[in-house]
């Protein structure tokens, strides 16, 4: 996907797409919705965002394709920023949009920064305002920049040693991936089910499911897996990656049999295991 950019005095790469208000989004639609022969439109923008043919065709059923595309992109891509959008428009050679809407976009970004940096309102000293926003250790207390991850790791306590190996292999190497490990990253005192749902659906691009005999007995793992599978049929295969790291005595879970397995127990492919997994989490 595209990287960030800058406009005037504002670093657009640090501004999430949510900063763009309705007026700017509507004007983008006026530029991109028409099927012009000489200018790239919303379908080219969707391709730059990483959508495939069937996903793009599905957007055609909405009356405002560009508006729906922007909404979907900022939900699915945690790196969706104003800078990323500008870079894609530049790559599409839509300099007319950058010129005409540049001041409006910069104004929206300035408003976002002012709101973010504004002092928090006074409240009861017994209530910490950060509590309603922070669910992970590195969350922004203001709630404007929630912590995001490359992958949520679904595991049971008995498999923690393999989770620790994943951390050393994927985070502390050149792959530099960011994993969401519940016992390490999530703050205590939060509702288990709602926080897990938030992390899987909105904070993590992928989910790695560590399959073992102990996994089959875990109600938490069962919930996490079924929740991830429920998040839209078109995203299942892209989102969830089953990993088998040791031999099992019990049958492999049937709900995961249709997804390609990353098998650490296969001696023929073990040498490629970490590279395959890292690339699957990076794409």
From Swiss-Prot:
| Compositionally skewed regions (Basic and acidic residues) per UniProt | 120-140
Annotated organism of origin: Xenopus tropicalis
Segments forming domain TIR: 147-281
Annotated gene: myd88
Keyword Cytoplasm found: yes
InterPro entries listed in its UniProt record: DEATH-like_dom_sf, Death_dom, MyD88_Death, Myelin_different_resp_MyD88, TIR_dom, Toll_tir_struct_dom_sf
What Gene Ontology biological process does one annotation of this record name?
innate immune response
Which PANTHER family did the record assign?
MYD88, MYELOID DIFFERENTIATION PRIMARY RESPONSE PROTEIN MYD88
Localized where? Cytoplasm
Disulfide bond entries: none
Q: What does this protein do?
A: Adapter protein involved in the Toll-like receptor and IL-1 receptor signaling pathway in the innate immune response.
Q: What is this protein called?
A: Myeloid differentiation primary response protein MyD88
The principal location of this protein is cytoplasm
């Amino acid at each position: 996907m595209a990287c960030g950019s800058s406009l005037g005095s504002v670093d657009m790469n640090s501004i999430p797409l949510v900063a763009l208000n309705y007026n700017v989004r509507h004007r983008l639609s006026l530029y991109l919705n028409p099927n012009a022969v000489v200018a790239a439109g919303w379908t080219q923008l969707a391709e730059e965002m990483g959508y495939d043919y069937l996903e793009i065709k599905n957007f055609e059923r909405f009356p405002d394709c560009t508006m729906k595309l922007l909404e979907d992109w900022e939900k699915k891509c945690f790196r969706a920023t104003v800078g990323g959008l500008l870079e894609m428009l530049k790559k599409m050679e839509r300099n007319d949009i950058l010129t005409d809407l540049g001041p409006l976009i910069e104004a929206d970004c300035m408003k976002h920064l002012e709101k973010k940096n504004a002092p928090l309102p006074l409240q009861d000293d017994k209530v910490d305002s950060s509590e309603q926003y922070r669910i992970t250790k590195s969350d922004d207390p203001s709630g404007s920049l929630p912590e995001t991850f490359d992958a949520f790791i679904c595991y049971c306590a008995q498999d923690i040693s393999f989770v620790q190996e994943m951390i050393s292999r994927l985070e502390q190497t050149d792959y530099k991936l960011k994993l969401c490990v519940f016992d390490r990253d999530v703050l205590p005192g939060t509702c288990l089910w709602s926080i897990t749902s938030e992390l899987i659906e909105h904070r993590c691009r992928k989910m790695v499911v560590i399959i073992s005999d102990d996994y089959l007995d875990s109600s938490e793992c069962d919930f996490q897996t079924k929740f991830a599978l429920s998040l839209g049929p078109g995203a299942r295969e892209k989102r969830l990656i089953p990993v088998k790291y040791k031999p099992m005595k019990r049958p492999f879970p049937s709900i995961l049999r249709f997804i390609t397995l990353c098998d650490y127990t296969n001696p023929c492919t073990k040498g490629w295991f970490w590279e395959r997994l890292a690339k699957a989490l990076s794409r």
